[in-house]
Amino acid sequence: MKHLLSIADLSRDEIISLLDEADRFKEVLEGREVKKLPTLRGRTIFTLFYENSTRTRSSFETAGKWMSADVINISASSSSVKKGESLKDTGLTLSAIGADAIIMRHPSSGAAQQLAGYVAPGGVGPSVINAGDGSHQHPTQALLDALTLRQRLGGIEGRKIVIVGDILHSRVVRSNVDLLSTLGAEVILVAPPTLLPYGVENWPVRTSYDMDAEIRDADAVMMLRVQQERMQGGFFPSHREYATLYGMSKAREASLKDSAIIMHPGPMLRGMEINFGVADAPRTAVLQQVSNGVHVRMAVLFALVAGSDATI
């Protein structure tokens, strides 16, 4: 595996291998006062973010540093991108400096694929990891969600996973649909008609407008943020009406079966798609998702950068 651009690029065995590797990293680091491994010593990793990020960026940086890599952060707002430099020239510059991997977030779908073509023609050059490209893909988020589901539910195959919210603009849901269906889960997407994408009937999912009917027997409910920054308005009448129909209220949380968990990729809009108290409930796995993100990203960096003869 040279790059990680999309969940669709991974086989079922590769997905399971990455999840197993993430579990191994968690086990090795657990209880250590100094969380440091020599695995990527001497390697140089760049994070290149054209959009804001808290969890993904800091998680990748932590993963690299815990593996002793040199991690260099670049924000588009403070780089030559502000002067009009193209994605191609930015990527080639980082490659010339000596990047072993470039982790990129970009507002345009397909940008990660473009960057990989620029910096590693013929497979020679730095690895590219897609940290989110437009509404297209966010593969490491889907991997950390799968790891969380596996840990909390004991497995994914045959489980009913309900994803609620802004399906239209979500790269997270597209990656999760690919991954969860590959691992044998039943995936149901719940949203108002205006927030379901064209062609969703061809996805390996079932769709519904009725949140209450779908969540009662769900094993996990994943809430999505309404991405207002990608909207011009008119997708739903008001925030209050949206929260009433598609928010995880205390009453809805109480209607879930005892073993069900609630997830959210973040950032959460408390009071809109999830109630303030529910966000902190014991069955809510948000912080476990964040913690798992570091171990999943360690596993991805290990697979792409460490080399075939490397050991943890």
UniProtKB/Swiss-Prot annotation:
Keywords of the record: Pyrimidine biosynthesis, Transferase
List of residues binding carbamoyl phosphate: R55, T56, R105, H138, Q141, G266, P267
Job description of the protein: Catalyzes the condensation of carbamoyl phosphate and aspartate to form carbamoyl aspartate and inorganic phosphate, the committed step in the de novo pyrimidine nucleotide biosynthesis pathway.
Database matches in NCBIfam families: asp_carb_tr, PRK00856.1
Any single GO BP term: 'de novo' pyrimidine nucleobase biosynthetic process
Family matches, as HAMAP family: Asp_carb_tr
Organism (species): Corynebacterium efficiens (strain DSM 44549 / YS-314 / AJ 12310 / JCM 11189 / NBRC 100395)
Broad enzyme group: transferase
Lineage: Bacteria, Bacillati, Actinomycetota, Actinomycetes, Mycobacteriales
UniProt record similarity statement: Belongs to the aspartate/ornithine carbamoyltransferase superfamily. ATCase family.
Quaternary structure and interacting proteins, as annotated: Heterododecamer (2C3:3R2) of six catalytic PyrB chains organized as two trimers (C3), and six regulatory PyrI chains organized as three dimers (R2).
Gene3D superfamilies: Aspartate/ornithine carbamoyltransferase
One Gene Ontology molecular-function label: aspartate carbamoyltransferase activity
Enzyme nomenclature, EC number: 2.1.3.2
Name of this protein: Aspartate carbamoyltransferase catalytic subunit
Name of the gene this protein is made from: pyrB
Catalysed reaction, written as an equation: carbamoyl phosphate + L-aspartate = N-carbamoyl-L-aspartate + phosphate + H(+)
Ligand binding (L-aspartate): K83, R171, R225
Pfam families: OTCace (PF00185), OTCace_N (PF02729)
